[in-house]
Swiss-Prot record:
Protein name, entry field: Protein SPT23
Sequence segments annotated as region (Disordered): 315-346, 376-417, 457-476
Species name: Saccharomyces cerevisiae (strain ATCC 204508 / S288c)
Keyword Repeat set for record: yes
Top-level taxon in the UniProt lineage: Eukaryota
PROSITE patterns: ANK_REP_REGION, ANK_REPEAT
PANTHER family in alphabetical order: ANKYRIN REPEAT FAMILY A, OCA DOMAIN-CONTAINING PROTEIN
Length: 1082
C-alpha cells in the first residue's frame, strides 16, 4: 500500500484520468466517496492530506463551474440506475425521531381550479365499496409532465404505514432533501380524506382517525415482526391521517412508454383507508383530495376522487368496478387488485377462525380438480371458457359455513366447507362430481394434510371432538337402502323434479346437512349447505317443520331440528311459502287445518343426498336428568350424570383385599344386576321419585328442573310414552305449562309422539292448549300432523278416543286461552284425583285400557258441560298451591270424595260452586315456606287477600225470620221502632267493624319496648352533650363510660395478657430524650 501525499495525489490524477477516459462526465460525488475510501484505507495518509485538500478545492471549483449547466451538459445521467445510486447514497430510511408534523387544513385547497395548474393528476382503481382491512392498488397518472422522464415522489409523513419506510431526518418538519439534485427532481404528494357532500358542490367535511380505529390499528401493528415500533406510529402523532400508503416515503418513478405519451408518468401505490364511514356519519362516503407540489411548495396538480364507502361487512355482490377520477378517457386496468388484499378479505368467514397457512395451495388444487372435471365433460373449446369462468367465480364466491356454537351432537371439520356458485351450471356440476368423490388419502394426500390442519385448528377453537378427515362429503351410498318403499317413491319424485335443468337454475337445493344425525327430541343446530337460499324458506325434516331457520347467505342456512315421532332417515326438503298463499289464522279449526295442509302440500325442493337420520336417545336423556335431580338433592349442586351414577353404584369405593370380600362383592353385584334387568327405565325413575315421597323429602326436590334445552322430566316422559311416570309427576306437582327454549309444552310433546292416554290426562288437568311454539304452532296442529295419517291403525276404542280428544281440542280452542288449571274455590282434596289412587299398582297397558273404557263413556259427556274452573285434576304450578296441598288428604279420602261428589253436582249450575266443595282446611305452611318451595308461583290476587262479602251478609249476628202472617199484622209504630233499633244496631256494628279491622303485627312489642326508648335516650344524650357545659356531670360521666368501654373492649378482643404485652411493647418504644434524667438530677 502506498503512503504519503504524493502517492494520494498520483492516485487522484490517475483515477481522474481513467474516469475521464472511460466516460466524459465524471461524477464528483462518486469520485469523492472513492477517494475518501482510498485515503482511509491508506495507512500513510490522513484527512489533512494535501492531496485530499487539493481534491476538496478542486471539487469546489468544479462544482462552481459545472453545476449551472449540469443538466444541459448531461453530467448527471437521467437513468434509473444513476438516480437509484444517488438516492441510496444521500437518503436513509428508518424513523428515529418522534413525528411532529405541522397541521395542514385540506379545506384551504378545495377551491383551487385544477385547470389552472400546470400538471394534471388522475387516480385509477379506486373501488366504490371497500373495507378497512382491504388494501387497494391505486394507479396515479401525471400528465403534462416535464421533459425529464424520471422523478422522485415524496409521500407525506402522516400517511406512512411503517417506521422502516420513513426517511431519516434530523428535522421531520423539514420536507427538503439534503441533496439538491434529488430535491429539484422530487414531486411532493399530499393526500387528505374528506367526507363527501350531498351534491356536486365543494361542501366537504374534514375527517380524522377516531379512537376506536386507532386502537384497532395499534393491535394490527403489534402483530407484525416490528412489534411496538410500528405501534408507536399511532401513539405519538396527533395529525395522523385516515389514508395510509404501504410504500417508502421517497421512491423513483419513470415513464416506460406504457401510456404512449412521453409527457405522462404512471406509478402505483398500495393504499388503505383506516376508518369507517359510519364513524363520521358520512352517508355519501369518503373522497380523497390529492395535491402535487414541487420542491418550492408550489401546487402543480390537484384532483378529488369519486366517493368510496368504507363498510364493516363485505358487499354481497362483488360487482364493484374500479373508477377513474379524471375528465379524460381512462384505459381499462388489467392489474389484479386482489393481490393486495388480505387472505381473509374475500372470504365470508369470521376473524376468530383463522385460515390455514396453505390455503392458497388448496385453492390451486381446487382449480385443478375443476379443470379435470371440465375436461371430462366438455370439449376443448368449451373447457377453456368454462375454466376461466369457474376460476373467476371461485375467486369471487368463496363461502364458508357459519361457525356458530353448535350443539352437543354437531361437529364441524374442514370437509364441511362448500364452495357455492349460483350463476354457472358447469361449475355446479363439477362441484357435485367433486363432492361425491370425497376426501381420500390415497387419491390426494395434499388435501388430506390440509384437511387435518384445518380440523386441528377447529378442534382447538370449539374444544370438541371432530370428525375424521377421511370422512366423505356426503352420506354413505347405501343410505337409501334403509328407507321404506313409500319414502323411496317420494324421493324419486323429488329427484326427478330436481333433474330438470331449468328448475335447478331458479329453485333452492341442499347439498349437505351438518350434522347428518341427531336426537328425535330435536333442539340441536343443523347447518344446511347448498345454493339459491333466501330468507323466509321453510325447512322440513320429513313431515316436521324446523323450529327456526336463518339464512346466512345464498349457500348457508342454519336451522334447529324439530322433534320427530319415530327414529330413522328422513329427507330434508325446502318449502317456498311465496308460491302458495298461506293462511296463518289458527284461531278457527278450518283455517288451522287449511294452513297445515298448505304447508304439507307445497312444492318441496331438495338435493340428491339431503338426508337426516333421527336417533332415539330419549331414555338416556331421561336418566341423565333424573340423576341430576338426585345429585342436586344429595350434594346441593349440579353435577355430571356420570359422576352421580358412579357415586350411587359405589364405583369409587376401594376394593376388598381378601377373597371372601371379593366374592361377597361380586355376588351382591350380580344380584343387583339381575334385579336391574327386571326393572325398566320408567320403573327405575318412578321408584326413585317415590323414595323421596316415602322419606318425606319430596318438598325439597325440584321435579321441574330442566336440561340445557329447557325440557323437564314431564316433557321427556310425555314424549317417550311413559304414562306411569307422567301420572306420578303430575300428582307430585310438576309444572304442566312450562315451555322449553323453543316454546314446547308437555302437551306439545305428547301430541307429537305421546300416547293418547297421556294427551287425555293432560287435557283433564286443564292445561293451556293455546300456547304457541316459537314457530307459531299450537298443540292441535301437531296432533293433526302426526296422527291423521295413522288414524286407521288404532282399534275402535282408540279411534273413538282420538275423536274425543280432537273434539276437546277443537272445543277448547274457541274458549278462553287464559284459563288457569285450578281456581282457589276448589277443594284441596279434589286435587288428589282417583286417577292417581293406585300408586303401587302395576300400570299395565291392559289395565289402563280397561280403566279408560270404564270411565270415558261416563266422564266425557258430563265433563263437556263443566266449567273450566271446576275440573277435578291435580295441582298445576301456575295455580299457586304448595306441593303439600296435593298430599293434604290420603288416597282413601280422595277416592271417597271423588265418588261422593261426582261431576253431576255441578251440572245444575255450572257457574256456582256448591257449598260442599268449600274447604275448611287451613293452608299448610307459612308464607316463607311457600316462598322457598314454590318460587314459580304467581302473586296472589286481590280477591284472595280481601275476599268479597257475600250477598246474604247481614249486619248483626242474629237472623230474624218474619213470616207472611206476622208481616201483615205489623203497625206503623212497630215499624218506626224497628227502624230506629236497626239504625242504632247498624251504628254499633259499624264501630265494631272499624275496630275489628285492626291488624296485629308481630313487631309491635319490639317497637314499643326497644326502638322508641332507645331513640329517646339517644336524643337526650345528644341534647345534653350539645347544650351542657364542658365540666358538668354529664360530660364527666360520658368520659368515664368511654374509658371503661375502651378497656372492656380491649380485654374482650385481646385479653388481659395480650393487653399487658402490647402495653409493655409500647412503653419500650417510648423515647424520653433524657427528660426524666434531667428531672431526677434537679
Amino acid at each position: 500500500m502506498m503512503s504519503g501525499t504524493g502517492n494520494v495525489s498520483s492516485m487522484l490524477h490517475s483515477y481522474s484520468a481513467n474516469i475521464q477516459h472511460n466516460d466524459g462526465s465524471p461524477d464528483l460525488d462518486l469520485l469523492e466517496s472513492e477517494l475518501l475510501d482510498i485515503a482511509l484505507l491508506n495507512s500513510g495518509s490522513s484527512l489533512q492530506d494535501p492531496g485530499l485538500l487539493s481534491l476538496n478545492q478542486e471539487k469546489m471549483i468544479t462544482a462552481g463551474t459545472t453545476t449551472p449547466g449540469k443538466e444541459d451538459e448531461g453530467e448527471l445521467r437521467d437513468d434509473i440506475a444513476s438516480l437509484q445510486g444517488l438516492l441510496d447514497r444521500h437518503v436513509q430510511f428508518g424513523r428515529k425521531l418522534p413525528l411532529r408534523t405541522p397541521y395542514a387544513n385540506p379545506l384551504d385547497f378545495i377551491n383551487i381550479n385544477p385547470q389552472s395548474l400546470p400538471l394534471s393528476l388522475e387516480i385509477i382503481g379506486l373501488p366504490k365499496v371497500s373495507r378497512v382491512e382491504t388494501q387497494m392498488k391505486l394507479s396515479f397518472r401525471i400528465r403534462n409532465a416535464h421533459a425529464r422522464k424520471n422523478f422522485f415522489i415524496h409521500l407525506p409523513s402522516d400517511c406512512i404505514a411503517k417506521d422502516k419506510f420513513f426517511t431519516s431526518s434530523d428535522d421531520p418538519t423539514n420536507l427538503t432533501i439534503p441533496n439538491r439534485d434529488i430535491n429539484e427532481r422530487t414531486l411532493f404528494l399530499d393526500a387528505f380524506l374528506l367526507c363527501a357532500s350531498n351534491n356536486n358542490s365543494n361542501n366537504f367535511k374534514q375527517t380524522y382517525v377516531c379512537n376506536r380505529c386507532i386502537n384497532r390499528e395499534k393491535r394490527r401493528a403489534s402483530r407484525r415482526k416490528s412489534g411496538l415500533n410500528d405501534n408507536s406510529i399511532w401513539q405519538n402523532n396527533e395529525n395522523k391521517r385516515a389514508i395510509i400508503f404501504n410504500s417508502k416515503q421517497l421512491f423513483i418513478i419513470s415513464n416506460n412508454g406504457l401510456s404512449g405519451n412521453s409527457n405522462c408518468i404512471n406509478f402505483d401505490l398500495p393504499t388503505r383507508i383506516v376508518c369507517y364511514c359510519r364513524h363520521h356519519k358520512a352517508t355519501n362516503g369518503f373522497v380523497v383530495l390529492f395535491l402535487l407540489r414541487d420542491h418550492n411548495g408550489d401546487i402543480l396538480a390537484k384532483t378529488i376522487t369519486d366517493p368510496i364507502m368504507i363498510m364493516d361487512k363485505k358487499n354481497a355482490s362483488n360487482t364493484t368496478t374500479p373508477t377513474s377520477t379524471s375528465n379524460a378517457q381512462v384505459s381499462p386496468m388489467t392489474n389484479d387488485t386482489r393481490s393486495f388484499s388480505s387472505p381473509q378479505s374475500d372470504l365470508n368467514f369470521p376473524s376468530e377462525f383463522p385460515l390455514p397457512s396453505n390455503s392458497k395451495n388448496f385453492v390451486i388444487s381446487t382449480n385443478c380438480m375443476l379443470d379435470s372435471n371440465c375436461n371430462n365433460n366438455n370439449n376443448d373449446n368449451d373447457n377453456k371458457n368454462n375454466i376461466k369462468t369457474n376460476t373467476a367465480m371461485m375467486n369471487n364466491n368463496r363461502h364458508f359455513p357459519s361457525p356458530n356454537s353448535s350443539s352437543e351432537d354437531s361437529n364441524h371439520s374442514f370437509s364441511d366447507i362448500h364452495f357455492s356458485n349460483n350463476n354457472d351450471n358447469n361449475l355446479h356440476r363439477s362441484l357435485d362430481s367433486w363432492s361425491s368423490t370425497g376426501f381420500n388419502s390415497s387419491s390426494n394426500p395434499a388435501l388430506t394434510t390440509l384437511t387435518s390442519d384445518f380440523s386441528a385448528a377447529s378442534a382447538r377453537h370449539t374444544g370438541k371432538r371432530q370428525r375424521s378427515v377421511n370422512e366423505p362429503f356426503m352420506s354413505t351410498p347405501n343410505t337409501f337402502s334403509r328407507l321404506p318403499q313409500k319414502f323411496i317413491d317420494s324421493s324419486k319424485d323429488i329427484s326427478n323434479h330436481n333433474s330438470v335443468p331449468v328448475a335447478l337454475n331458479n329453485k333452492p337445493s341442499i347439498q349437505r346437512v351438518i350434522p347428518a344425525q341427531g336426537s328425535i327430541n330435536g333442539g340441536i343446530e343443523v347447518t344446511l349447505l347448498g345454493s339459491k337460499f333466501k330468507q323466509g324458506l321453510i325447512i322440513k325434516f320429513g313431515e316436521n317443520i324446523a323450529l327456526s331457520s336463518q339464512c346466512w347467505n345464498e349457500s348457508t342456512m342454519v336451522t334447529y331440528l324439530p322433534p320427530s315421532s319415530k327414529p330413522g332417515p328422513v329427507l330434508v326438503t325446502i318449502v317456498d311459502p311465496s308460491e302458495t298463499s298461506m293462511r296463518n289464522n289458527s284461531n278457527s279449526s278450518v283455517s288451522t287445518s287449511n294452513s297445515t295442509n298448505d304447508i304439507l302440500h307445497l312444492n318441496k325442493y331438495t338435493g340428491e343426498k339431503a338426508i337426516f337420520t333421527y336417533v332415539d336417545d330419549t331414555d338416556r336423556q331421561l336418566i341423565e336428568l333424573a340423576l341430576q335431580i338426585v345429585g342436586l338433592k344429595m350434594n346441593g349442586k349440579l353435577e355430571d350424570a356420570r359422576n352421580i351414577a358412579k357415586r350411587i353404584v359405589g364405583s369409587d369405593s376401594s376394593p376388598s383385599n381378601n377373597n371372601a370380600g371379593l366374592h361377597s362383592q361380586n355376588s351382591s353385584l350380580n344380584s343387583y344386576t339381575n334385579m336391574m334387568r327386571n326393572i325398566n327405565d320408567e320403573q327405575l325413575i318412578t321408584e326413585v321419585i317415590k323414595s323421596f315421597k316415602r322419606n318425606n323429602n319430596l318438598s325439597t326436590v325440584n321435579l321441574s328442573m330442566c336440561d340445557v334445552r329447557g325440557r323437564t322430566l314431564l316433557h321427556l316422559a310425555a314424549f317417550n310414552n311413559w304414562y306411569s311416570l307422567v301420572s306420578l309427576l303430575i300428582k307430585y306437582g310438576s309444572h304442566l305449562n312450562d315451555q322449553d327454549l323453543f316454546g314446547f309444552t308437555p302437551l306439545h310433546m305428547a301430541c307429537i309422539n305421546g300416547d293418547l292416554r297421556i294427551i287425555r290426562l293432560l287435557l283433564e288437568c286443564n292445561v293451556n292448549i293455546m300456547k304457541k311454539t316459537r314457530n307459531g304452532f299450537i298443540a292441535k296442529q301437531f296432533f293433526l300432523m302426526n296422527y291423521t295419517v295413522n288414524k286407521t291403525r288404532y282399534s275402535n276404542y282408540e279411534t273413538s278416543l282420538f275423536d274425543d280428544i280432537l273434539t276437546r281440542l277443537t272445543k277448547n280452542t274457541t274458549g278462553s286461552s287464559d284459563t288457569q288449571p285450578f281456581e282457589r274455590n276448589v277443594s284441596q282434596s279434589s286435587f288428589n284425583s282417583s286417577l292417581f289412587d293406585d300408586d303401587d299398582a302395576d300400570h299395565d297397558y291392559v289395565q289402563e285400557r280397561k280403566y279408560l273404557l270404564a270411565d270415558s263413556a261416563a266422564l266425557a259427556p258430563e265433563q263437556s258441560n263443566c266449567n273450566d274452573n271446576t275440573s277435578f285434576s291435580i295441582l298445576d304450578s301456575d295455580s299457586g298451591y304448595d306441593i303439600s296441598d296435593c298430599e293434604s288428604s290420603s288416597d282413601e279420602i280422595a277416592l271417597e270424595f271423588f265418588n261422593t261428589h261426582k261431576i253431576k253436582d255441578f251440572s245444575s249450575k255450572p257457574n256456582e260452586i256448591p257449598k260442599t266443595t268449600k274447604t275448611s282446611i287451613e293452608p299448610d305452611g307459612s308464607l316463607w315456606n311457600r316462598m322457598l318451595t314454590r318460587l314459580n308461583d304467581e302473586l296472589p290476587k286481590y280477591e284472595d287477600l280481601f275476599p268479597k262479602k257475600p250477598k246474604n251478609w247481614e249486619l248483626g249476628s242474629k237472623s230474624v225470620e218474619i213470616g207472611p202472617d206476622n208481616s201483615a199484622q205489623m203497625t206503623v209504630d212497630d215499624s218506626q221502632t224497628s227502624s230506629e233499633d236497626d239504625e242504632l244496631e247498624a251504628l254499633q256494628v259499624g264501630f265494631n267493624t272499624i275496630f275489628s279491622k285492626k291488624q296485629n303485627f308481630q313487631n309491635d312489642k319490639m317497637l314499643l319496648f326497644f326502638w322508641i326508648p332507645l331513640t329517646l335516650v339517644l336524643l337526650l344524650c345528644f341534647t345534653l352533650s350539645n347544650l351542657g357545659k364542658d365540666d358538668d356531670m354529664f360530660h364527666n360521666l360520658s368520659k368515664i363510660v368511654q374509658e371503661y368501654l375502651r378497656i372492656g373492649l380491649a380485654k374482650v378482643l385481646l385479653g388481659n395478657e395480650r393487653m399487658k404485652t402490647s402495653f409493655k411493647m409500647q412503653l419500650s418504644k417510648f423515647q424520653n430524650n433524657n427528660i426524666l434524667n434531667d428531672m431526677r438530677v434537679n
